[in-house]
Amino acid sequence: MYTAQDEKNLNEIKQFLDDNGIEYSTEYDNFCLHYGNPDGKRSYEISYVPSAMYPIKYPKYNIDGVGMEFFYEQSYKAEHEQNSFKCWVKDYEWQDDRKREVLKSYFLYAAGKIKKTFYARECEVREVPTKEARDFESKNCFYGKRGASLNLGLYTKKEKHGVPKGTLIMIYTFGHNFFGKDNSIEVLRVGTLKFCNVAGGASKLLKYFLRNYETLTVGKKEVPVEIIKFYSDYDHNIGGSMDSLGFEFVNYSGGGFMNYWLETGEVKGRQPSKHKWVMEQMSEGKVLAIPNAGVKTFVMHVDREKYPLIEKKPEDEPSKVLF
């Protein structure tokens, strides 16, 4: 059933949990934290996926497999019927050095084992220069860097946990909502320095944005800060804190997919301009479409009575208007 690489991956996950004193119940490729829902706590299932065993079926290419909503349906059932959350870990994700470290950070947070906790009051908000923002995302965000119109970050006011004063430890980035037809803004990336937690950090960054920006400059366009959308990666996050931040749940996308090249291990998302070529590669047995759980969509309709704009003086610089 499993390849030697799968066995290695599973052993590494188990060893990491053991080394960090994380309690779990296990069965085959599933490591369940908070098994039995102690004190009503939602279980957290680390579910390993040998991706080549779960391709999306394409009968015309003689590919047996599953439906595109295979993982979404299991995630939905776990969330709504079993008081659990499934964190899907594809083999190619664990074998990616950068993503593996982000996943480890997720596991520690879920288990309450993060050792470096900061508080929002110990940080100041600044606009993050583009290069610094993309570098931070590349190291600390699961899906890496993504261009944005505005990058806001939390910087430490003093040294703590061996992290120097003035270090960027959390980021929120904003841009135009790519998928929406409305005049809305999207939270593009949210990331925290790996193996750290910033209590109250998301709230501080979001409030700063809402109170300091009436519009967002996107290219040559000024987009009013009225509607904000957030797409939560349902493969790895349940979006449990969104309501406390003022977002309302809208819908599930259902399943999505990534294209996986078997020979090189390369993984890419949907490429509309190369669709014909990708299908040719699939017909030749070189690529498989691997399903995922899709996203959960949340929206905020900005209430200006709750988030009144801060009046700025002409001499104020964006990085100095702190909240």
Question: What are these model-predicted stretches?
Answer:
Residues M1-E27:
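Acidic-basic catalytic patches of nuclease active cores, encompassing PD-(D/E)XK
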Residues L309-F323:
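Short, cationic low-complexity segments
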Residues Y260-S283, V287-E305:
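C-terminal "cap" of GNAT-fold acetyltransferases
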Residues K60-R98, A202:
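Catalytic cores of nucleic-acid endonucleases
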Residues P38-E73, N177, N251, W261:
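Short beta-strand-loop-alpha-helix junction that forms the active-site gateway
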Residues D18-D29, G144, E248-Y252, S283-I290:
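Short secondary-structure junctions
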Residues V102-L245, F249, G254, T297-V302:
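A conserved beta-strand-loop-helix scaffold within acyl/acetyltransferase catalytic domains
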